[in-house]
Design a protein with these regions (language model features):
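N-terminal secretory signal peptides that target proteins for export/translocation
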Residues: 1-14
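Formylglycine-dependent sulfatase
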Residues: 11, 31-478, 482, 486-536
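Bacterial N-terminal signal peptides
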Residues: 16-29
Length: 536
């Protein structure tokens, strides 16, 4: 063999060896890259307070607030406060739907009001939720707290009769009763021994522990798809004293309303501790039951507030629960890789004694007009705080308009994935804002009062298609420039008819398109109730 042939052979061997080494290296790198993302992805903890007003958080209301919230402010000092953040609705279930799906609730059957007692699920089984999205990408997902989005209760029409005509502070369709009949109790035992379908564990969550609604039956905890214990006594009306919007119904013997919030805190801390010990990132959705009625303040927190009001005590207890969650994250040594999001489902409820609070110098809506259920800002402008160490600058604020629907797109971008066209139709990622950009991310944000009055916000302009509070009335339209009039004191609809027409047409387009973000046109579940009418 000649020298040239030997050299050629030698070079061929070297090339073959190099190729083998490159293949081995590629396989190793590919395997490593595949293994790294699940570990590197941040944990996500979403804390949703219930009926906590914009002015109930001390960092949002330093001059007109009298309730200290040091633990919520602790999140703010380590992250970003959004000053123009909104829930999708002025009340409960609609906001929960929108937060979990990234889609406005008024695209569903819920054109007004909330999901009722024993009602079917509002989230369609095939609808992607933030939990389902996270689960697709290797997350363990848990929900601890108030669900209030409906279940597939296995209850026949005949059995439903045993659950009707009980009273309470909100009426409930009947007078207050002192006890249930023997026949009713037997039916209850049968109903609540069955599995309950259609809840959180069928909507993307691996586990669930909580109460469906703390002021409605059944008065028991639900774990995954079963009641914890069998509600077999009638909750006495005395337990609901001074707790508006609460109903009598089946309860566990010795059920204590003031034990609910501590139990949820215990379970949430346990979830964090357990999940932090695994190789999986986790998403914890913690919809608290407070400070919503029943104002069930634990004994240790009664009388703690300086203004001597049970609601103030309950807000302070709620704040302490937030502190327990933050402590659990730190004790589990995952704080540096955990996104904490804190917000509220709507504004403070006027019926908890707002006039007394304001007389004592505490204004639950701060500088805003209105309260829970309203289309006014006080109904849906809420605290919204995000902490993400090494990603979000501490102690910062953002003035851009955002909404609770934005969690879906935000989480998708954190995961590095693109949402399908039929998911998160109204959601826009907050990451640009969290990284310090200062620009509008929404063409418009839509609000709705609890009765069903729609309102649209674009830039500083807000158009309410009816009165700011109370029943739907198509004869009214109210236009405000919030940059000049945050308190919504001067209606500009007569002075700027062109802006009224512009925003009305924009609202129509958002309805017809089935989405408010770029993407393929989608269908609403029902015909959206929108009739601007002929305003006077």
């Amino acid at each position: 063999m000649s020298n040239s042939q030997l050299w050629s052979c030698w070079c061929g061997c070297i090339r073959a060896i190099m190729i083998c080494l490159w293949v081995i290296a590629f396989i190793a790198i590919a395997g490593y890259a595949k293994a790294v993302p699940p570990k590197a992805l941040p944990n996500i903890v979403v804390i949703l307070a219930d009926d906590l007003g914009y002015g109930d958080v001390s960092s949002y209301n330093p001059t007109q607030g009298k309730i200290p919230t040091p633990q919520i402010d602790r999140i703010a000092s380590g992250g970003m406060r959004f000053l123009d953040a909104h829930s999708a609705s002025g009340c409960c279930s609609p906001t929960r739907y929108s937060l979990l799906t990234g889609r406005y609730h008024w695209r569903t059957r819920l054109q007004g009001g909330i999901v009722g007692v024993w009602e079917k699920p509002l989230i369609a089984k095939e609808r992607l939720t933030i939990a389902g999205l996270a689960k697709q990408h290797g997350y363990a997902t848990a929900c601890v707290g108030k669900w209030h989005l409906g279940w597939d209760w296995s209850i026949s029409e005949q059995e439903r009769q045993s659950l009707k005509n009980f009273g309470g502070q909100a009426g409930g369709g009947g007078k207050v009763k002192t006890e249930a009949t023997k026949e009713q109790v037997e039916v209850w035992k049968e109903i609540f021994s069955r599995t309950i379908q259609g809840g959180p564990t069928s909507r993307g969550f691996d586990t669930y522990f909580g109460t469906d609604v703390p002021n409605w039956p059944p008065y028991c905890f639900i774990e995954n798809d079963r009641c914890v214990g069998i509600p077999s006594v009638l909750l006495p009306a005395s337990a609901l004293k001074k707790n508006q919007a609460s109903l009598q119904g089946p309860a566990l013997p010795q059920w204590e309303l003031d034990a609910i919030l501590p139990a949820l805190a215990d379970r949430a801390c346990s979830v964090i501790k357990q999940q932090a010990q695994t190789q999986k990132p986790f998403l914890l959705y913690l919809p608290l039951t407070s400070p919503h009625t029943p104002i069930a303040v634990s004994k240790e927190w009664q009388g703690k507030s300086s203004i001597e009001h049970p609601y103030a005590d309950f807000v302070m207890q709620t704040d302490a629960v937030v502190g327990r969650i933050l402590d659990a994250i730190e004790e589990a040594k995952v704080a540096d890789n955990t996104i904490v999001i804190f917000t509220s489902d709507n504004g403070c409820a006027s019926y908890i004694g707002v006039k007394e609070l304001e007389a004592k110098g505490h204004f639950p809506s701060g500088p805003l007009h209105g309260y829970k259920a309203d289309a006014w800002e006080g109904g849906h402008r809420v605290p919204f705080i995000v902490r993400w160490p090494n990603n979000v600058a501490p102690n910062t604020t953002c003035q851009q308009t955002i909404c609770s629907v934005d969690l879906m797109a935000t989480i998708a971008e954190v995961l590095g994935v693109k949402l399908p066209d039929d998911a998160g139709e109204d959601s826009v990622s907050l990451l640009p804002l969290l990284r310090g950009e200062d620009r509008p991310i929404h063409e418009a944000v839509v609000h709705q009062s609890c009765p069903g009055i729609l309102a649209i916000r674009s830039g500083p302009w807000k158009l309410i298609f009816g009165p700011g509070t109370g029943k739907v009335d198509n004869s009214k339209r109210l236009l405000y420039n919030l940059a000049d009039d945050l308190g919504e004191s001067k209606d500009l609809s007569m002075e700027h008819p062109e802006k009224v027409n512009e925003l009305t047409n924009l609202m129509r387009r958002l309805i017809v398109q089935g989405r408010s973000t770029p993407g393929e046109k989608q269908a609403n579940d029902v015909r959206v109730r929108f009739d601007p009418g002929n305003p006077r």
